[in-house]
Amino acid sequence: MAAAAATAPAAAVVRRMKLGSQGMEVSAQGLGCMGMSAVYGERKPEADMVALVRHAVAAGVTFLDTSDVYGPHTNEVLVGKAGAAAAATEEEVQVQVATKFGITPAWEVRGDPAYVRAACEGSLRRLGVGCIDLYYQHRIDSTVPVEITMGELKKLVEEGKIKYIGLSEASASTIRRAHVVHPITAVQIEWSLWSRDVEEDIVPTCRELGIGIVAYSPLGRGFFSSGAKLVDELPDDDFRKSLPRFQPENLEKNAAIFEKVNAMAARKGCTSSQLALAWVHHQGSDVCPIPGTTKIHNFDQNVGALSVKLTPDEMSELESYASADVVQGDRYHGTFLNTWKNSETPPLSSWRSGN
């Protein structure tokens, strides 16, 4: 029996949470905005996306996630407009915008000080703000000591251009080195039922250091919403069509994971996406998932995940469906940008002034 028609209570309350230990407070679920402008097919109509963001903020989801490489640049412009419109409508609501730097429009990774500063200035301009709430290094430049990149970010904090610093796809050792220069507020990682390798070192390191965890792609890039049939519905220019897990030889085997999750969702009276998202929420009060969508209906369904309760036995059962030996295919293809597995940087002693 399919669970598509069943939903958890639509009026789920979106609680607030402390993200990290530096004072940042956000909604316990965020909104990933990438797909509104880039990567997942063609750019969506601006008016529709502004309406979606306003709907999200009115519902209590006030933590918006973007990056300068989405578009490139157009997603930041959209989020800036939409966030401002939402804030104007919901006068007592504080909208937090997180953006990122480090991936150039040519899909190269850079973390040198001059680039960091120029990227920040560009994001401030496109977002239409005087200060960025949370500024992530999107990917780690393996040619620049992370201390050098962090040093420039620290200056930007001191100048009032950013409030909090984050890292994305960073290893535990890189996180530790960066945190010495300036406290890291949040680390963004891919964390979902079928992407759990971060649990060994990265998650414990974040918790040891008081760093919040932002889980991107918590629905497996849409896989846990509709399973293998998702790929048949994607346009040719959708990024997911190139990913190993979505290739026919892997997708056929991964389809069984979705079917088991979907069956459990039917038993619990929720959708498969709500169940998978609830699993991420149950990882701890320091974890903020940021599912993305371009449809208000899907957004409402995602918020409903906050009302889904899971027992320890149910958590274990879900995890058994998507254990490491069951999931077929890597997260990215081998030629893609740096992930946390290749985010180590040279020692600080190797850097010379003027590099």
Curated annotation (Swiss-Prot):
Any one annotated GO CC term: cytoplasm
Leading EC class: oxidoreductase
Nucleotide-binding keyword on record: no
E.C. numbers: 1.1.1.-
Binding site for substrate: 138
Catalytic machinery residues: 70 (proton donor)
Xref: InterPro entries: Aldo-Keto_reductase, NADP_OxRdtase_dom, NADP_OxRdtase_dom_sf
Keyword rRNA-binding included in the entry's annotation: no
Sample GO molecular function, one term: aldo-keto reductase (NADPH) activity
Keywords linked to the UniProt accession: NADP, Oxidoreductase
Superkingdom: Eukaryota
Binding annotation for NADP(+): 217-227
PANTHER family: AFLATOXIN B1 ALDEHYDE REDUCTASE (PTHR43625), ALDO-KETO REDUCTASE 3-RELATED (PTHR43625:SF37)
UniProt record similarity statement: Belongs to the aldo/keto reductase family.
Name listed for the protein in its UniProt record: Probable aldo-keto reductase 3
